[in-house]
């Protein structure tokens, strides 16, 4: 801790904010678009850390809010998709994050791919 907070990069600031939240030993960790504003390297580093953190049996339950399915960390078990302020679909992640559901929610033909432990989508 030999640097002032204001001199940290966005990725470093996000890690500090998450670390501060964890100091209170919460039962639930709510992450609202934690990768917003990060470059590709910062995003991937943070997602890797989330995946490692979530695999710890002592870690609190986590809710991650994102607009980009490629930002869903590996190890995520459930998903909920909102549309027009309500729940469009929820359940086990592989049943929720599908081409059919994403196309319906965005009212645009979408292709969802699952590669390794990550999801990717594109408009058709």
Q: Where is each model-derived feature located?
A:
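H-loop/switch region of ABC-family ATPase nucleotide-binding domains
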Residues: 66-67
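H-loop (His-switch) and adjacent beta-strand-loop-beta switch element
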Residues: 77-92
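Conserved ABC ATPase signature
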Residues: 4-8
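Catalytic Walker B motif of ABC-type/P-loop ATPase nucleotide-binding domains
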Residues: 29-32
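A short, surface-exposed alpha-helical micro-motif characterized by mixed small hydrophobic
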Residues: 72-74
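Conserved catalytic motifs of ABC-family nucleotide-binding domains
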Residues: 25
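ABC ATPase nucleotide-binding domains
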Residues: 105-124
């Amino acid at each position: 801790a030999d640097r002032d907070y204001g001199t940290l990069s966005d990725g470093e600031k996000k890690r500090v904010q998450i670390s501060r939240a964890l100091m209170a030993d919460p039962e639930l960790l709510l992450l609202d678009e934690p990768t917003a504003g990060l470059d590709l390297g910062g995003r991937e580093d943070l997602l890797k850390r989330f995946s490692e953190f979530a695999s710890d049996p002592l870690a609190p339950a986590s809710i991650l809010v994102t607009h980009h399915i490629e930002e869903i960390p590996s190890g995520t078990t459930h998903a909920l998709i909102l549309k027009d302020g309500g729940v469009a679909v929820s359940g086990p992640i592989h049943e929720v994050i599908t081409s059919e559901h994403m196309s319906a929610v965005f009212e645009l033909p979408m292709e969802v791919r699952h590669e390794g432990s990550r999801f990717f989508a594109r408009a058709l």
